Amino acid sequence: MRLSEAWLRQYVNPMVDTAGLVRQLTMAGLEVDGAEPAAADFSGVVVARILEAAPHPEADRLQICRVDTGGGEPLQIVCGAANARAGLVAPLAMEGAVLPGPLKIKRSRLRGVESFGMLCSAKELGLEDDASGLLELPADAPVGADIRDYLQLDDRILEIDLTPNRADCLSVEGIAREVALINRLPFRGVDAGTVAVGSQRRLVVHLDAPEACPRYLGRVITGIDARAQTPRWMKERLRRSGLRSLGPAVDVTNYVLLELGQPLHAFDLERLSGDVHVRQARDGELLRLLNGEEITLSSDVLVIADEEKALALAGIMGGEQSAVGGATSDVFLECAFFAPALIMGKARRYGLATDSSHRFERGVDPSLQRRAIERATALLLEIAGGEAGPVTEAVREDLLPLRAPVRLREQRIGQLLGLNLPRDEVADILARLGMSVEEDEPGWTVTPPSFRFDIALEADLIEEIGRVYGYDAIPRRRPAVASAMQPASETVLGLDRVKDLLADRGYQEVITYSFVSAEMQRRIDPEAEPEALLNPISADLAVMRISLWTGLLDCAQKNLSRQQDRVRIFETGLKFVRRDGSLEQRNTLAGLVLGSILDEQWGEKSRRVDFFDVKSDVEAILGLTGKSSVRFRPAIHHALHPGQSAEILIGDGGAGWLGMLHPQIERELGFEQPVFMFELDAGALLQRDLPRFAPLSRFPLVRRDLALVVARDLPAADLLEAVAASGGPLVRDTVLFDVYSGAGVEAGKKSVALGVTLQDAEETLTDDRVDEVMSRIVARLAADFGAKLRE
């Protein structure tokens, strides 16, 4: 919300500067985002009156003006503005003045005629975008006065970021009420008075939807001057609040909205037919709004209508057919209370965001309407003349919201604030907040004022007491805690270390919902029975996840839909598995990879990621555990490709899964490239085996390569385990460096090349000893797997 500091200080003027005022509001919970100057920096501009305006002899569009500046001889000014005329009061930039830009005004000669200054438009002063003519000032403006002083331009615009619960502060009066409260100053709201009725013309109002609109006030105002102009002081206040002037009728309604927080609307009376109805729209009914957009209404939308048509989207925006214009002389002024629950969301449905809907959605004081319509009437009559008819009020008192009393306990204040306030100070704060207070022994019964929609609980009252007392005034009490250093076990692998490793390998951490859709859960494991939520947020978040893959797949889909086709993500969190009738929470690490193995670059050609790329990432994670008993065993998982999936084992226990997403699920979810996933039990992962020291051998390594023909479906891991077991302590490492099937290898077989590295810690290995070990290895592989040396 934007408002003028000078306007605010007309209601309440504390003895603090702008910085102090900003701090007061922020500490009271009304965060001020900034305080900017109300006008651009300029100097040397005064209020001047044009005494004479004669055509320039050498230019059709120029006039030679004699201008009174309030002292000395009138100045000769050459001006090209279309509205320059004798008697007009306008800003004059004197010789030597500096305008925004910066532009320094000098004596000049225009088409042979000297000009001793420049008459200014609003745009040239940086006040408005209108450059069509001179800025017209009231005829009684003091000639010779500095324009900055006259228009109060040495002002600041406060930008206040209000939380949704503080609808009572969506007005200058509301902010002024808070400033008075903070500074213990007296405060009186705007005294609207009662406008004298000069006409008996009125319209009958029917509340056809009283639950949505329990109070509606209307007034006919006739005979307003269609040529009247909004006064400069009102235009300036509107401008500083971010609104532009649209004519007296609209400007007055906008002004009262800013001043009191009550939206109003003015209809062109001549465009209305018969009585006014506040009703639900008819399905398919059309309404062209003030912004020119035609919308199709539905029956859950509230409209203001006459006997023939919908006139306005209630509480949101008026219609084009009944809008006031430049020729309007009779208006029907509307001021109503609309129930927040029935207005909420309707503006967003039609892509609208208006000042009215912003206030009605959050709640408008249901007792404000009479004062607001009297204030608007008085301002409109003052500016444009006319006669006001009687106020027509349609109301259902039983449907108006009432503020329920709230019990406040003295003991509870101390518990929540950590501060024991005297009872009389608590009562004083509540009274200053405008609340009705009845005191009893354990505390108070407090009734909030009608404008405080956000006060419903005891905690709400205590929050108000805390912020008015001052959060910064509450004494600090640091707890006396004795800290003791505790040894950290080296056998525990920290989860942060695992996250760092994955980040180093190009993964990004994500956090997804623990609740997922039942349909997605069935895809991952159709046999599992996920725990259903009794009151889910939505149908897509109806069950508790049995795997972190559900959230990762959803995240990958969202990334792909935003043209992010290389995804490497991981998540740590709980999954919920039902076992033996009870629900278990298991801490889990899961990851998902798709797209190219490398980011696009010139130095190396990239390729699609494959199973073994992701397997190497999992091996790197498991390598942090120091466990030597890690194995990958081909196995079937409902969510994984039957030919590219493996169960991860540590010892004889299952520790997780790795594989490519099942092709059927891939198609159902719309993935157009392979998706690889892994999931690890964090409990098994985070127990680490400490490394044991062994002296380094100073004798040379010996490597022998084996090319073996084995069954095509034999896992290479089985061969590696057999080599390690049969080779004995001399075998230091075995590496798989080639797999081949095709010409030269019989059908159903494959050729596997192994590099076996041997070393003795005591002496240099001889060929005989190496041959003996290799023969033993080959014999074991032949016996266990039918392996043959490839010729």
UniProtKB/Swiss-Prot annotation:
Its EC number is 6.1.1.20. GO terms for cellular component: phenylalanine-tRNA ligase complex. The keyword NADP does not apply. Binds 2 magnesium ions per tetramer. Keywords: Aminoacyl-tRNA synthetase, ATP-binding, Cytoplasm, Ligase, Magnesium, Metal-binding, Nucleotide-binding, Protein biosynthesis, RNA-binding, tRNA-binding. One of its GO terms (biological process) is phenylalanyl-tRNA aminoacylation. Residues 39-148 form the tRNA-binding domain. Mg(2+) binds at D454, D460, E463, E464. It catalyses: tRNA(Phe) + L-phenylalanine + ATP = L-phenylalanyl-tRNA(Phe) + AMP + diphosphate + H(+). GO terms for molecular function: ATP binding; magnesium ion binding; phenylalanine-tRNA ligase activity; tRNA binding. Its cofactor is Mg(2+). Its main location: cytoplasm. NCBIfam families: pheT_bact, YtpR. Tetramer of two alpha and two beta subunits. This is Phenylalanine--tRNA ligase beta subunit. It comes from Methylococcus capsulatus (strain ATCC 33009 / NCIMB 11132 / Bath). The gene is pheT.
